[in-house]
């Protein structure tokens, strides 16, 4: 069976305040990186899955929705490539 490497990217929805991103932005400003704005902090989760691609895609979509993200507050997208 084929193996797939997945990357899941999870970020707060634009309407949700990002205190961690704001802290990073302030720190950058204090370090004279004053041209940086709109910093948002998210998560990258990497997984390896085994199976046929359609089933792996369905499984990954469910894992992303049910376990790796909170759809109320976060947006999530994933990339899948053969390992």
Where are these regions (language model features)?
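Non-catalytic terminal accessory/regulatory regions of metabolic enzymes
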Residues: 1-83
């Amino acid at each position: 069976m084929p193996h797939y490497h997945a990357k899941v990217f999870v970020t707060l929805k634009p309407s949700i305040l990002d205190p961690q991103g704001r802290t990073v932005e302030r720190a950058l400003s204090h370090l004279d990186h004053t041209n940086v704005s709109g910093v948002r902090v998210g998560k990258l989760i990497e997984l390896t899955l085994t199976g046929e691609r359609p089933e792996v895609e369905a499984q990954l979509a469910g894992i992303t929705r049910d376990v790796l993200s909170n759809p109320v507050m976060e947006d999530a997208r994933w990339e899948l490539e053969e390992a």
